[in-house]
Amino acid sequence: MLLRIYEENPNEKAIEQVVQVLKKGGIIIYPTDTVYGLGCDITNSKAIEKIARLRGIKPEKANFSFICYDLSHISDYIKPIDNTTFRVLKKALPGPFTFIFNASNRVPKLLSSQKKTVGIRVPDNLIARCIVKELGNPIVSTSIHDDDDIIEYSTDPELIYEKYKDQVDLVIDGGYGDNVASTVVSCFDGEFEIIREGKGDLAEFL
């Protein structure tokens, strides 16, 4: 199903429709402030395994990120951070960053990498954040952007739908997406290291 939602004013009934799909173990494709994402409810292990199969990888090696609503949401899934790190996050989020932290015990074992780390996103996109807020917990997410694919697949929701309609339960048309992924930043011991350059410029917030 292709569902149109306008970011400027997301329709509550449409958001609830998406949340019901997620609660039933469904897989969705949804807009962010960067490329479109492929996601499911963090509490549904079968849905997580399905996404991993779609990507052809094992869940524990998938480098999924958690889409959170705000900073308070983040704190449930990472180990305590220092004040410097918190101040940077407060300035940078919502925004086009994936921050890598040490994972807390609340991270499902299925998603715990050998390094015991987790990637956290608070996208500057009202549709994604409204879904997470209504759901009550994060979305486990991975990008559908593929360097081997024609670039339009990651930006045009109708093309995305045509490609993935038989593999996912719902595609949200939130308008054209970006074709630049998030900037990935590791955050350990108060130090920030750019792992992947992307849309976000962390220097603005340091």
Where are these regions (language model features)?
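Active-site-adjacent structural elements in enzyme catalytic cores
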Residues: 1-206
